[in-house]
Amino acid sequence: MQAFKKLTSSAIPLWLSDIDTDMIIPANFLTQTTKDGYGKSLFHNLKEKDSSFIFNNPDYSNSEILIAGDNFGCGSSREHAVWALTQAGIKVIIAPSFSDIFFNNAAKNGLLLISLDKDTVKELCDKAEDPKFSMTVDLQEQTVNVDGSIYSFDYDPFRKDCLIRGLDDMTYLIEHLDIIKQFEQSQRG
């Protein structure tokens, strides 16, 4: 997992609520046995149906932040949705709320999800309509900086530490293997 500390990027405005995992990556693209290759299918059906869909706009092709509406990532528990987003270059999603399962999948795969109040997210989304608009996300400080305005966000301390250090669950366990072995031995008596 790639470490994340701070990012300055333009943002993709996607003010839709209840974006489910099937919208993010349709089920017919889930035929691979590896994690690779899902980014090209991100929002496939929406891109095909609507040529003006924001992910068809080349002005946002280098954006690493997505701003969305309520309940992002709802639907099935498919981890492929997170893989598709990260492989398409998304490193941060800002929304008023996220599905719990999606939130956990994102944290385990290095995708930072930030919950801010709905009015603030809508304001940021409106500003992001200008492709030249940018913001800075600082995980260490837990802030989003927009034109000098600073918005603080909460984030689980354990997940924050793992993301800052680039540790997935397995790497974290391996890093603490000696402590785990000591504990297991102490339990045997």
Swiss-Prot record:
Biological process annotations from GO: L-leucine biosynthetic process
Keyword Amino-acid biosynthesis among UniProt keywords: yes
Reactions catalysed, as given in the entry: (2R,3S)-3-isopropylmalate = (2S)-2-isopropylmalate
UniProt keyword annotation of Repressor present: no
MF GO annotations: 3-isopropylmalate dehydratase activity
Pathway note: Amino-acid biosynthesis; L-leucine biosynthesis; L-leucine from 3-methyl-2-oxobutanoate: step 2/4
GO cellular component terms attached to this protein's record: 3-isopropylmalate dehydratase complex
Family the UniProt entry places it in: Belongs to the LeuD family. LeuD type 1 subfamily.
UniProt protein name: 3-isopropylmalate dehydratase small subunit
